[in-house]
Amino acid sequence: MESIILSIAIFIGVLLGTSVGAGSGSSISPDVDAGSGSRTSPDVDAGSGSRISAGVGTFSGSSTSPDVDAGSGSSTSPDVGAGSGSSISAGVGSRIGTGIGSRIGTGIGTGIGSRISTSIGSRISPDVGTSSGNRISTGVSTGISTTMNARVAVLITAAILSAPVTAIALLEARR
């Protein structure tokens, strides 16, 4: 009977020892290891490595350096290049070249050619022609013919009105 009680006590002791061992070993140590190893160290590494380092790397590399490069390269340099090349060069080339070519060249050519030539040709020649031909000639001829017609009409009217008087005067002269 005592041996049975002793074996039960040893069995209970072994169970308690194993439970405590499993409890300390498995639950506490691995949890701390998992906590420290997995959660703390990798989180710090991930935080420092990925978030801070990579963040600084990304910021410096992508945002700051390329933005400065893009700013200087794309916005400033090409803008200055495009500004100088397109606006100033092309401006000087196009505006002064084309301006002088088109506006002065075409202006003088077309202006003097069309406006002065056409002006002299159209306005002076046809105006003088039209003015002299139609207005002066027609005006003079119409004026003269109208005036002549008016005088003839006055003479005819005077002759008609004076016909009886003339006839009476002729009859009396015969007597």
UniProtKB/Swiss-Prot annotation:
Cellular-component GO terms for this entry: membrane
Keyword Transmembrane belongs to the record: yes
Subcellular location: Membrane
Record topological domains on the Cytoplasmic side: 24-151
Membrane-spanning parts: 3-23, 152-172
Keywords attached to this entry: Membrane, Repeat, Transmembrane, Transmembrane helix
Topology Extracellular: residue spans: 1-2, 173-175
Region of interest (Disordered), ranges: 26-88
Entry keyword Membrane: yes
Bias (Polar residues) ranges: 59-78
Membrane topology, as annotated: Multi-pass membrane protein
Name this polypeptide is given: Uncharacterized membrane protein YFL067W
Biological source species: Saccharomyces cerevisiae (strain ATCC 204508 / S288c) (Baker's yeast)
